[in-house]
């Protein structure tokens, strides 16, 4: 099927990859994320995480001052001092992520060499890795992709058959998924990222990859380079996507369709029942998805096929066909897709099309609301447990809620 694809470039309106630290630091409590950046970087992460500094969270910022940016001070020397002080204060840290930012990249601070140097200085005490969270060329979810890619070289090699779930899931969702895989007869099952940064799963020719998020292309390719095999499937958002996701894994491990159906059928029935009250609020409503997270195709598929919404346009920051083809195949043939962003032109199309709901970044939401256009923050979908059949009702409610709010505030 040939879908209409509009490629755009121009001014963008997205968060940077530093935002992903908010969910990654919760996933790996023995890791610390040290951003090498400006005060703006520090304010962004602290505000996004909703954590006060005196609570000693597992992230922080080594702030580049004016002398650093002007090249009048040795930023590497200062970074070494900051890391030494941090490790002395926080002896529980086992993995230290040095996270690049727009300012550190502008002054060409080589954090890969810094990581090598710090590994030598603190050998046996902590593992130091680095990745870029800069938003110069990427969107916010790609921060996780960069972080996981940085861990791949540290993963031991193995030829043992296993399933590897790639991408951060809420703990409760992951537990339910592991239980379902056990009932299906699939195992062992490992996760990347792991709950402890020092307990990285092995990977090799016997490993089959199942992605939980569509924005992990770089990680998937790094794992494939180590011999792993990617299982292609839609993503586990909504009842349909979750069922197809589990069925793809079952087929890859030789599980019969009959057994898979017997395990999944109760969940599918329960998930569809949970969807029904929200479907009534969403059915027939017109939806415009602005590019922000790379989750837009999966969300559009869910909202159109399971909730009855009409897709005006589905935008994505980057269309990775190797990871998104299964989602593309489930979208209507006449849907308008856009890749990349020219924010002024896209906002003009929003105004002209008069959608009932726009899914967009926080920076665009308030201006659109002021124009009378109902919006949903796309970043909330990354922070919320939305994966799996059991969460399908909650996922639909996230979109029904702003429509109900708008209805409650409308006066005759």
Swiss-Prot record:
Catalytic EC class: oxidoreductase
Signal peptide interval: none
Database matches in SUPFAM superfamilies: Helical backbone' metal receptor
Annotated binding of [4Fe-4S] cluster, by residue: 16, 41, 102
Pathway(s) per entry: Porphyrin-containing compound metabolism; chlorophyll biosynthesis (light-independent)
Record field: catalytic activity: chlorophyllide a + oxidized 2[4Fe-4S]-[ferredoxin] + 2 ADP + 2 phosphate = protochlorophyllide a + reduced 2[4Fe-4S]-[ferredoxin] + 2 ATP + 2 H2O
A Pfam family the protein falls into: Oxidored_nitro
Example GO molecular function: oxidoreductase activity, acting on iron-sulfur proteins as donors
Manner of cofactor binding, per the entry note: Binds 1 [4Fe-4S] cluster per heterodimer. The cluster is bound at the heterodimer interface by residues from both subunits.
Annotated EC: 1.3.7.7
A GO biological-process term: photosynthesis, dark reaction
Keywords, ordered alphabetically: 4Fe-4S, ATP-binding, Chlorophyll biosynthesis, Iron, Iron-sulfur, Metal-binding, Nucleotide-binding, Oxidoreductase, Photosynthesis
Cofactor(s) annotated in UniProt: [4Fe-4S] cluster
UniProt record similarity statement: Belongs to the BchN/ChlN family.
Alphabetical list of HAMAP family matching this protein: ChlN_BchN
Annotated PANTHER family: LIGHT-INDEPENDENT PROTOCHLOROPHYLLIDE REDUCTASE SUBUNIT N
Function: Component of the dark-operative protochlorophyllide reductase (DPOR) that uses Mg-ATP and reduced ferredoxin to reduce ring D of protochlorophyllide (Pchlide) to form chlorophyllide a (Chlide). This reaction is light-independent. The NB-protein (ChlN-ChlB) is the catalytic component of the complex.
Subunit structure: Protochlorophyllide reductase is composed of three subunits; ChlL, ChlN and ChlB. Forms a heterotetramer of two ChlB and two ChlN subunits.
Protein name, UniProt field: Light-independent protochlorophyllide reductase subunit N
Taxonomic placement: Bacteria, Bacillati, Cyanobacteriota, Cyanophyceae, Synechococcales
């Amino acid at each position: 099927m040939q879908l209409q694809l509009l490629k755009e470039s121009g001014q963008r309106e997205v968060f940077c990859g530093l935002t992903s630290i908010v969910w990654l630091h919760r996933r790996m409590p023995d890791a610390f994320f040290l951003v090498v950046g400006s005060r703006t970087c520090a304010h962004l992460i602290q505000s996004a995480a909703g954590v006060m500094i005196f609570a000693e969270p597992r992230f922080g910022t080594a702030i580049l001052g004016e002398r650093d940016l002007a090249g009048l001070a040795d930023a590497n020397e200062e970074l070494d001092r900051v890391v030494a002080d941090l490790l002395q204060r926080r002896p529980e840290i086992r993995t230290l992520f040095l996270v690049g930012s727009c300012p550190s990249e502008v002054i060409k601070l080589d954090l890969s060499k810094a990581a090598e140097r710090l590994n030598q200085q603190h050998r046996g005490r902590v593992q130091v890795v680095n990745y870029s969270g800069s938003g110069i060329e990427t969107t916010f979810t790609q921060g996780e992709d960069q972080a996981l890619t940085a861990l791949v070289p540290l993963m031991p090699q193995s030829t043992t058959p296993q399933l590897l779930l790639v991408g951060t899931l809420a703990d409760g969702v992951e537990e339910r998924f592991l239980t379902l895989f056990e009932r299906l007869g699939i195992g062992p099952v490992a996760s990347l990222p792991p709950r402890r940064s020092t307990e990285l799963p092995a990977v090799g020719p016997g490993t089959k990859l199942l992605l939980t998020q569509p924005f992990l292309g770089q990680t998937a390719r790094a794992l494939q380079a180590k011999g792993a095999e990617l299982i292609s499937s839609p993503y586990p958002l909504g009842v349909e996507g979750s069922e197809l996701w589990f069925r793809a894994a079952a087929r890859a491990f030789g599980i019969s369709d009959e057994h898979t159906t017997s395990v999944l059928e109760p969940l599918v029935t329960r998930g569809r029942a949970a969807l029904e009250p929200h479907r009534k609020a969403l059915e027939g409503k017109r939806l415009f998805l602005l590019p922000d997270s790379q989750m837009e195709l999966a969300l559009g598929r869910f909202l159109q096929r399971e909730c009855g919404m009409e897709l005006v346009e589905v935008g994505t920051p980057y269309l990775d066909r190797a990871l998104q083809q299964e989602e593309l195949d489930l979208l209507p043939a006449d849907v308008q897709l856009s890749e990349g962003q020219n924010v002024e032109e896209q906002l003009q199309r929003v105004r002209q099309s008069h959608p009932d709901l726009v899914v967009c970044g926080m920076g665009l939401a308030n201006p659109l609301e002021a124009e009378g256009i109902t919006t949903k923050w796309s970043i909330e979908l990354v922070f919320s447990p939305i994966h799996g059949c059991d969460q399908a009702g909650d996922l639909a409610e996230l979109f029904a809620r702003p429509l109900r709010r708008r209805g409650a505030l409308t006066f005759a």
